Amino acid sequence: MAMGKRKTCRHEPLFLAATDLPRTPAHPFYERLNQILAEHQFDPFVEGLCQPFYAEVLGRPSLEPVKYFRFLLLGYFEGIDSERGIAWRLADSFSLRAFVGYARYEATADHSTLSRTRRLIDLETHGQVFQWVLTILAEEGLIHGKTIGVDATTLEANAALRSIIRRDTKETYQEFLTRLAQASGIETPTREDLAKVDRERENKGSNKEWEHPHDPDARIAKMKDGSTHLAYKAEHAVDLGEGAVGAVVAVTLVGADQGDTATLMPTLGQAARNLQAVAADPEAAAQMNAELVREAVTDKGYHSNGSLLDLDETGTRSYVPEPDRGPRHWEGKQAEKKAVYANRRRIRGQRGKRLLRRRGEYVERTFAHIYETGGMRRLHLRGRENILKRLLIHVSGFNLSLVMRKLIGNGTPRGLQGQVDGVVSLFWSLGQVLQSVRGLANTSR
């Protein structure tokens, strides 16, 4: 046999027969996911929602909305953080092409087309797709709706601290320090002089004074590892009802400087609106609790007189651990006292302890799956609206994984691959045992 050599320069054929194109079987996970989407009429639903954003006749060729949303779902299932990475991964995989809806001979869309389509379709439409996915979960009996756990995490923004500018004068940080040094008598300050001025200055990271010119919605904040970055705060409302599996029923995005007590009620309000939209479907409503968002379970960061009073006034029972604040004084605060004491009684009961444990399990798990293995901890988009669009569909991918876990036992393609590897290992082990038994039998003879 003659040795062939890799051709570094070749002339591509002008025409290529369809039979000569590479063939590969569809990925069983994505094939089953596409079946679920087809059974629930995903394509007609999305096309109807997005019709107002496209020209009725003529117009330049575009990325179909059903392909666009499948693109974003791949970000979760493949653990890809950027739209550029999603486009590269799709172009390199025949099974992913089949999932999105590309023929073998079709060129896939690049990241700029994906970005342009995201800007074309508004935030409300992304929210409606998120609600549509929740309806699938409800029809499968995976949403209860009465008890909601809430927690938040920080996401690093695609913006560097060294690029921030002052809100009033639009000076850069370097220009601002230079002006302060000159005002103190240093005509030509060196780097050491600027560093000294910076160390001696108070309120260096004030969000009231500084912003990023290209991402004004991001806020200066300390991350969990102790570093300081421009960041956003993503807050999840997770279903914790009896028989629930931890579906995310609402996700909100705000600047990282907003406290937990300030964002609790808006997040619960969004959860209530989403669940009410889901309950409009009779089949989904039959599987859900008649009372929606009637219990809120959080960590101690959400505990305050005001937040507990707000929950009490809306008829929502709170299960919020109380931090040690020493002796409390209730003069003129009888309503706040009543709400705090009622919450204290609930968290000390057996049901309260059980719900707090469930919150720690289910809510924290959503952060691990969506932001760590799902690849969204570090953002690559700028602007709250752009990020929230991507985040809503990314979280929808997590919710769809709960449906897949119920139907096929695994929620991601990697999980299914691990299951197959386990079966292969089991058969290999059985084969080794059989060989050992046969060897012992032959020896005894």
Predicted regions and their residues:
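Short, flexible loop/hinge motifs at secondary-structure junctions
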Residues: 1-23, 416
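A short, ordered amphipathic alpha-helix with a cationic face
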Residues: 19, 59-62, 102-104
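Intrinsic-disorder-associated interaction segments
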Residues: 22, 26, 35, 166-169, ...
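Basic, short loop/linker segments at the boundary and entry of helix-turn-helix/winged-helix-like folds
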Residues: 26-73, 78
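Short amphipathic alpha-helical interaction patches enriched in hydrophobic/aromatic residues
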Residues: 54, 75-76, 98, 118-121
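Anion-binding and metal-coordination hotspots
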Residues: 80-91, 102-445
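Secretory-pathway/luminal and periplasmic proteins that interact with or process carbohydrate-rich
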Residues: 95-101
